[in-house]
C-alpha cells in the first residue's frame, strides 16, 4: 500500500516539475530503475508494487516521441543511449532472473512495445537482436506460466518484423555444433520432443553474432502496425492438450544452425490455453513463408517442426474412435484450423467422436495451409514428412487392414482429407501415397506393384457395398483434384499407344465412305440385331440436340474426319431398347438437364487440365506400338467389371460406378474420348471399351426382359418411387434389375450429352 502511494506521489511530482530535455528525462527513468536494484533490500516484493513498470512505460513514450519529432530514419539521442548502454541486455538479465517477481513479464511487454511502436529498423543492431535472441529462448520454457500471453505477443511481433524484412531472419539462425544424441532434454519441453535446444536454459555459449549492419539507421522505413493482428477472442481452445507421441531418439549430428524462434513457438503450440497455441501456430505460419533459403533449410532440418506436424496428426488420428459413421465423417461441417470451437452441449447433431474428428480435421487443415504458405523447399520437406510419418506410418496400416468396419472408417477419413487438401505440394505427396509414382503402362501381372493402390482399387469391387461406394467416392474426388499424375496413373498411361484399336489402312473405297461421314469398318447399328428398334421415328434429330445445346457458338467447320456427332449421340441414346425406357413417361427427366450439367462440368475440367498441355488429337496410329498387348489398367478393369454387372447390383453402387465413369469421360484428352465415348472405334481382338461393355449389358437385358411379366409398368413404378412421385408400397419383384435398367438409361443419356458437349467445344474456332 505504501509503495503504491509512493508511485502516485512520484507521478504528481513529475507532472509538476519543469520538463527536461528528452534525453535527460530518458536517462532519469533508466537510472531510477537501476537505483532500485542498488538500494532495495526486499527482492521478494512483486514488481507491480514498485515504480519499475511506470519508468519503463515512460522510457517507451519518450522513444516514440523522439522518433515522431525527427525525420524518418534518423536515430535520436535517447535511442542512441539505449543502444550504446545495452539497456536491452540489462533488461534481459533482469527478466531472466525475474527479480523482482513479475519482472520477466514487464521486460516482455517492453520489448514487444518497443519493436511494435518504433518504426525505424531496430533488429539489425547487434545490441537489439542479441538480447532479443536471448529473450526468445526464455519463451515457452515452462507451459501454462503467468507470462505465456506476454511471451506469445513478443514472439509474434518478432515474426511480424521478420515478415516485413525477411533478410533479418539470418540474425536468428545460431551456430550449433553439438550432437543431438548427446544432449539432455531441457525442462521446457516434454520427453517426447526432439532434443536440440541447447541454449534454452542458459545464455552462455552464445554463438558468434553478425556485426551491426553499417548504415542500418538510414534504411528505408516501412510502417508496421503497432501490434500484430490478434484474433484470440474468437479462436477456439481446441488445439487440445493431446500430448505429442514419442519421437525417435536422434542419433545423428544436428545441422550446424539453431532456430530458437521456431523452437519457442513449437513449445507454445502445446500450451493448454488454446488461444496461446493458435497464436503460436500463426507465428510458425509467418516464419515458414519467409523466402530466405537458409531459414527454410534450418526450419526443416534443425527444428522439430516436421515432427510436431506429423506426430500431432498421428495423435489426433489415433484418438478417433475405431468406428465412426462414414456419413458423419463426410457431412461434418467444414473445418478451418483455429476456428473449430465446439460445444457438445450446444450441438444438436452431435455424435460419438465428433470432438476428436473436428480436432483431427482442424490440425490437418493447419498442416495443409502451413505447407501451402511455406517457402518452396520448406513446403516440400514438410509435405514429405507428412507422407512418410503420417500417411505411410499411420494411415496405411489402417487402410490395409481386413476388418470391414476399420476399412470403412479409414477409407472415409481418407476420402475426407482428399476433399479437404488444397496445397499442391501436399496433394502431390498424397497422390504418390495413394497411387504410387509409376507412369509406365500396367500389366495384369504387376497390378499389385503398389500394394495400397491395388488394395484400394480392389475395394471398389468389395463384397461390402458400403466399402465399395466409399472407395469409389474417394476416387471420384481424387479425379477432380488439379494433379496430372492422378489421371495418368489410373488411366492414361495404358491408352498412350492406342493399342486398344485395330489398325486398318484405308483403301480408296473406304476414303469415299469417310468423306460421307462414316468410319471404315464400323458396324452400322441399324443392321445390328441388338438395335432393331432404331428407326427415323425414335432416333434423336440433330436439330433437337442443337436446340438444347450450350450457348450458341460460331458455325462448326466442315466434317474434319470425325464420326459425326449425331451418330455418336444416337448410338448412346438408342442403346437401351424402347421396352426398357421409362424416362419419357415422367416430366423433367429429359436429356437437356444432362447437357447443361455436362457443359458446366466440361468447362471446369478444361480449366483444370489447361496447364497439362494435352494433345488436341489422338497419336497417329502409324506411330503407335499396336503390337503390344493391351490392358485397360486395374482401375478401368474394375469399373468395367462393375458396369457389366449393373443389372445385378444395388442402386447406390450403380450410381457411384456410373458417376466415376462419367467423370472420366469428361476429361478433354483425345485418347480418353476415343476409348470411352466413340462407339465406332475399331477395337482390337480381345479388347473392350465402355460402349462394348454397355452393348453386352443391353444384350443380357433384352433376354431377361422377356421373362418378366408387366415389365414396363413395373419399371415406370420403380422410377416414380425413386423420384418420390409415388409412395413406397409393396416390394416389387426384380427390383434390383429394374433399378439397374433405370440407371443404365440415365447413364447412356449422360454419355450422349458429354459426347455432344465435347464435340461442340472442339468444333468451336
Swiss-Prot record:
InterPro entries: FHIP, FHIP_C, FHIP_KELAA_motif. Residues 196-208, 535-550 have a biased composition (Polar residues). Residues 193-236, 532-561 are annotated as: Disordered. Pfam families: DUF5917, KELAA, RAI16-like. Belongs to the FHIP family. Required for proper functioning of the nervous system. This is FHF complex subunit HOOK interacting protein 2A. It comes from Homo sapiens. The lineage of its organism: Eukaryota, Metazoa, Chordata, Craniata, Vertebrata. The gene is FHIP2A.
Amino acid at each position: 500500500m505504501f509503495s503504491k502511494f509512493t508511485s502516485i506521489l512520484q507521478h504528481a511530482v513529475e507532472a509538476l516539475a519543469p520538463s527536461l530535455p528528452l534525453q535527460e528525462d530518458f536517462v532519469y527513468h533508466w537510472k531510477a530503475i537501476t537505483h532500485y536494484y542498488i538500494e532495495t533490500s526486499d527482492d521478494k516484493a512483486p514488481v507491480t508494487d514498485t515504480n519499475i513498470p511506470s519508468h519503463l512505460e515512460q522510457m517507451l513514450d519518450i522513444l516514440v516521441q523522439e522518433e515522431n519529432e525527427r525525420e524518418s530514419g534518423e536515430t535520436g539521442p535517447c535511442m542512441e543511449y539505449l543502444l550504446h548502454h545495452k539497456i536491452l541486455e540489462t533488461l534481459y538479465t533482469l527478466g531472466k532472473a525475474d527479480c523482482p517477481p513479475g519482472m520477466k513479464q514487464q521486460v516482455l511487454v517492453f520489448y514487444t512495445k518497443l519493436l511494435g511502436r518504433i518504426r525505424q529498423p531496430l533488429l539489425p543492431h547487434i545490441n537489439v537482436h542479441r538480447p532479443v535472441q536471448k529473450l526468445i529462448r526464455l519463451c515457452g520454457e515452462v507451459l501454462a506460466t503467468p507470462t505465456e500471453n506476454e511471451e506469445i505477443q513478443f514472439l509474434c511481433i518478432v515474426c511480424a518484423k521478420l515478415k516485413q524484412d525477411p533478410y533479418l531472419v539470418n540474425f536468428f539462425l545460431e551456430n550449433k555444433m553439438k550432437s543431438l544424441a548427446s544432449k539432455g532434454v531441457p525442462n521446457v519441453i516434454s520427453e517426447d520432443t526432439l532434443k536440440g535446444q541447447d541454449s534454452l536454459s542458459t545464455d552462455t555459449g552464445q554463438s558468434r553474432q553478425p556485426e551491426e549492419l553499417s548504415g542500418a539507421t538510414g534504411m528505408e522505413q516501412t510502417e508496421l502496425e503497432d501490434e500484430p493482428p490478434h484474433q484470440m477472442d474468437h479462436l477456439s481452445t481446441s488445439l487440445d492438450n493431446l500430448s505429442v507421441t514419442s519421437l525417435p531418439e536422434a542419433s545423428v549430428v544436428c545441422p550446424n544452425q539453431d532456430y530458437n524462434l521456431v523452437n519457442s513457438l513449437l513449445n507454445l503450440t502445446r500450451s493448454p490455453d488454446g488461444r496461446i497455441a493458435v497464436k503460436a501456430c500463426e507465428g510458425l505460419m509467418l516464419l515458414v513463408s519467409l523466402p530466405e533459403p537458409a531459414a527454410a533449410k534450418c526450419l526443416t532440418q534443425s527444428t522439430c517442426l516436421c515432427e510436431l506436424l506429423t506426430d500431432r496428426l498421428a495423435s489426433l488420428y489415433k484418438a478417433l474412435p475405431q468406428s465412426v459413421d462414414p456419413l458423419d465423417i463426410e457431412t461434418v461441417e467444414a473445418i478451418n484450423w483455429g476456428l473449430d470451437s465446439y460445444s457438445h452441449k450446444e450441438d444438436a447433431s452431435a455424435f460419438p467422436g465428433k470432438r476428436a474428428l473436428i480436432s483431427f480435421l482442424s490440425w490437418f487443415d493447419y498442416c495443409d495451409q502451413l505447407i501451402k504458405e511455406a517457402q518452396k523447399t520448406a513446403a516440400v520437406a514438410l509435405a514429405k514428412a507428412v507422407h512418410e510419418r503420417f500417411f505411410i506410418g499411420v494411415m496405411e496400416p489402417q487402410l490395409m487392414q481386413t476388418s470391414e468396419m476399420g476399412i470403412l472408417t479409414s477409407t472415409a477419413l481418407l476420402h475426407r482429407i482428399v476433399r479437404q487438401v488444397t496445397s499442391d505440394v501436399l496433394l502431390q505427396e498424397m497422390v504418390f501415397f495413394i497411387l504410387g509414382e509409376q507412369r509406365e503402362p500396367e500389366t495384369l501381372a504387376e497390378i499389385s506393384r503398389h500394394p495400397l493402390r491395388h488394395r484400394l482399387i480392389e475395394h471398389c469391387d468389395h463384397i461390402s457395398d458400403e466399402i465399395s461406394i466409399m472407395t469409389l467416392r474417394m476416387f471420384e474426388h481424387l479425379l477432380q483434384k488439379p494433379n496430372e499424375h492422378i489421371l495418368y496413373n489410373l488411366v492414361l498411361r495404358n491408352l498412350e499407344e492406342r493399342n486398344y484399336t485395330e489398325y486398318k489402312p484405308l483403301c480408296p473405297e473406304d476414303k469415299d465412305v469417310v468423306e460421307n461421314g462414316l468410319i471404315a469398318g464400323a458396324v452400322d447399328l441399324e443392321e445390328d440385331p441388338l438395335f432393331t428398334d432404331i428407326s427415323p421415328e425414335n432416333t434423336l434429330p440433330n436439330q433437337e440436340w442443337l436446340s438444347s445445346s450450350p450457348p450458341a457458338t460460331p458455325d462448326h467447320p466442315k466434317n474434319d474426319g470425325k464420326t459425326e456427332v449425331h451418330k455418336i449421340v444416337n448410338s448412346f441414346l438408342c442403346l437401351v431398347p424402347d421396352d426398357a425406357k421409362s424416362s419419357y413417361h415422367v416430366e423433367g427427366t429429359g436429356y437437356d438437364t444432362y447437357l447443361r450439367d455436362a457443359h458446366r462440368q466440361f468447362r471446369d475440367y478444361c480449366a483444370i487440365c489447361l496447364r497439362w498441355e494435352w494433345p488436341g488429337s489422338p497419336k497417329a496410329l502409324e506411330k503407335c506400338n499396336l503390337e503390344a498387348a493391351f490392358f485397360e489398367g486395374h482401375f478401368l478393369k474394375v469399373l468395367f467389371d462393375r458396369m457389366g454387372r449393373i443389372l445385378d447390383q444395388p442402386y447406390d453402387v450403380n450410381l457411384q460406378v456410373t458417376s466415376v465413369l462419367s467423370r472420366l469421360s469428361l476429361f478433354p484428352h483425345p485418347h480418353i474420348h476415343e476409348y470411352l465415348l466413340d462407339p465406332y472405334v475399331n477395337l482390337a481382338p480381345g479388347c473392350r471399351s465402355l460402349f462394348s461393355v454397355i452393348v453386352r449389358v443391353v444384350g443380357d437385358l433384352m433376354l431377361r426382359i422377356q421373362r418378366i411379366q408387366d415389365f414396363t409398368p413395373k419399371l415406370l413404378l420403380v422410377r416414380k418411387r425413386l423420384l418420390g412421385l409415388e409412395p413406397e408400397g409393396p416390394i416389387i419383384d426384380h427390383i434390383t434389375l429394374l433399378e439397374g435398367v433405370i440407371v443404365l438409361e440415365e447413364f447412356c443419356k449422360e454419355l450422349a450429352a458429354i459426347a455432344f458437349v465435347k464435340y461442340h467445344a472442339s468444333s468451336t474456332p
